[in-house]
UniProtKB/Swiss-Prot annotation:
Residues 267-284 are annotated as: RNA-binding. Belongs to the RapZ-like family. RapZ subfamily. Gene3D superfamilies: P-loop containing nucleotide triphosphate hydrolases. Keywords: ATP-binding, GTP-binding, Nucleotide-binding, RNA-binding. It holds the Pfam family RapZ-like_N. InterPro entries: P-loop_NTPase, RapZ-like, RapZ-like_N, RapZ_C. ATP binds at residues 8-15. Homotrimer. The keyword GTP-binding applies. NCBIfam families: PRK05416.1. Modulates the synthesis of GlmS, by affecting the processing and stability of the regulatory small RNA GlmZ. When glucosamine-6-phosphate (GlcN6P) concentrations are high in the cell, RapZ binds GlmZ and targets it to cleavage by RNase E. Consequently, GlmZ is inactivated and unable to activate GlmS synthesis. Under low GlcN6P concentrations, RapZ is sequestered and inactivated by an other regulatory small RNA, GlmY, preventing GlmZ degradation and leading to synthesis of GlmS. It comes from Proteus mirabilis (strain HI4320). This is RNase adapter protein RapZ. One of its GO terms (molecular function) is ATP binding.
């Protein structure tokens, strides 16, 4: 099991790194006192956590490096600690603090920002010197840092993107969480068949009705082709979800069928897919 210890100078991106690690499946704890590391690791080992990450900053640094080393030696045998240290040049840190107007953790000790940054560097040097990976974030954006961590730790640039296909009825309103909205009200409507009206797009007779129409096939094919074309770009855009909303008049027949067809297609391509049907969920 991996225990990633994230440290670095304030303003270098520790919070960004911790969020990126959480997206990668790490159990994350922010600002954990060093002497609690063994206890946390033991608890996570009992819960079969595959990977964990903790951040340590200047506020919870031990008084001597020996305390940190002792904490690492006390970790359960199944944990492999790795130390990630984030840094940035002095001018970049000053600019970031100026932009965010936040106080440096050591500014409470009546130090100027410049002196606080320099003092922090000295206090964190024992951690920096034993780091397994040092990343200089001076020229990085938030997204670039997250991307680098995924590349270094997972061997891939994109995070696991979850595609969500949801059906809805326009008469109930457009979902506010949708990234893409497709209108299928022009497709043949099973509602006008008295036998199909009580059914939904999940029922075989409705699916058979829609499957007989060429325009339905063409719409599904062109929609999935559009999504396939841009999916690689979306996967590298630092997002966790892509929500595709399919709407018909009532959200009961056409939109449900089309959403399921698209979900099945991308699921068969190995994508992480969810489907939901807003109108049908309201009826339960």
């Amino acid at each position: 099991m991996v225990l990633m210890i994230v440290s670095g100078r304030s303003g270098s991106g520790k919070s960004v790194a911790l969020r990126a690690l959480e997206d990668m499946g790490f159990y994350c704890v922010d600002n954990l006192p060093v002497d609690l590391l063994p206890e946390l690791a033991k608890t996570l080992a009992e819960r079969d956590a595959a990977a964990a990450a903790v951040s340590i900053d200047v506020r919870n640094m031990p008084e001597s490096p020996e305390i940190f080393e002792k904490a690492l030696e006390s970790l359960p045998a199944e944990y492999s600690p790795q130390l990630l240290f984030l840094d940035a040049d002095r001018n970049t840190l000053i600019r970031r603090y100026s932009d965010t107007r936040r106080l440096h953790p050591l500014s409470t000790k009546n130090l100027s920002l410049e002196m606080a940054i320099d003092t922090e560097s000295d206090l964190l040097e024992p951690l920096r010197s034993r780091a397994d990976l040092i990343i200089d974030t001076s020229e990085m954006s938030v997204h670039e840092l997250a991307e680098m961590l995924r590349t270094r730790l997972l061997g891939k640039r994109e995070r696991e993107l979850t595609m969500v296909f949801e059906s809805f009825g326009f008469k109930h309103g457009i979902p506010i969480d949708a990234d893409y909205v497709f209108d299928v009200r022009f497709l043949p409507n099973p509602h006008w068949d008295p036998k199909l009206r009580p059914m939904t797009g999940l029922d075989r007779p409705v699916a058979a009705f829609l499957d007989r129409h060429t325009e339905v096939h063409n719409f599904i094919y062109q929609t999935r082709s559009y999504l396939e074309l841009w999916l690689p770009m979306l996967e590298t855009n630092n997002r966790s979800y892509l929500t595709v909303a399919i709407g018909c008049t009532g959200g009961k027949h056409r939109s449900v069928y089309v959403a399921e067809q698209l979900a099945d297609y991308f699921r068969s391509r190995g994508k992480n897919v969810q489907s939901r049907h807003r109108t049908l969920e309201k009826r339960k």
